[in-house]
Amino acid sequence: MLEIEIENEELISPDPTQKVQKTFDLTQLKLSKKEEDKKTGKIRMLYGNNSEYFGRVDKNKKKGRGELTLPNKDKYVGKFNNDLFDGKGVYTWANGDIYEGDFKNGIMEGRACITFVNGDVYEGGVKNGKKDGAGVYKSKKMDSIYNGMFSNDECTGCGVWENEKLRYDGYFKNGKRDGEGVEIFYPEKYNMKNPPLKFVGHFKEGERDGLGVKEFKNGLKYDGNFVKGKREGQGKLVWPKEDRNGEINIKVFSGNFKNDKPAEGKGSLIWGPETNYNSYDGEFKNGKFNGKGKLKKNDGEEYDGNFEDGIYHGFGKLKKKMENYITVISIKKYMMAKVN
């Protein structure tokens, strides 16, 4: 009845972007006794915890360009003001992550390029030590790139995410697709008989959720509601099916869906002109006509009555067009024909 073959691709979600590490708290640095009398100029300052500073100072406070090696093996090279990182600088963490960009009052803030030890790279805005504003994030693991807005270290706002299998253009929230968006699939990258081509609709917490339209390579198209990535609720499904002669017949089902499949309840099914059938309007169960319904055939035959498992069954009226006249027949508990 509703012979629909739909392979659902695994939803590809962006990996969480790497968090920016905190820099060392410079208030923890204490000068050794022999360095306390140094006041101004370009000097080397030694600290009691195996760290050192080489650069300019003013009244014993770091100011201007300098190099600071910290007790945890982090290193900073750049501008200082009033003993704090301030201006352009490069901060290298002991694990290999590198921040190159702006600092303000000891905090990473402004524009920067951050290279992570896992190969990921971020270029864009930074606020209060976190990715913020417009930026570009390249993920080595997924061979993907995100170009868009960030907030609180996460992809949030409008952006474009792309890898070898698909391109998403839309809204994000806390690193996940959330809001209106468009997915463009690259079908040659999917090992599927009928790969997807495009999805336009709503997302929630990384899943297709809400109204949307999804199209497939063979012409199949679903227009309706989604819940957590699956067809759920009211929708319309248009799909082609090749017959024995190689001709493509189009069917259109409108009704209720549950867990990706046509569900129990009222719906309608329309066939293309190439088939024997015209339309069905009535009740469905398990993808078959069940309950009350009306079936029309292209030869003029109509049946209005009860169905069971896709066949005439129970009370109903059958109108058959025979040459120049129509016969009306009442039937009860009689199997007339199976609808293919």
Language-model segment annotations:
Residues M1-N340:
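Intrinsically disordered, low-complexity repeat tracts enriched in Gly/Pro/Ser/Thr and acidic residues
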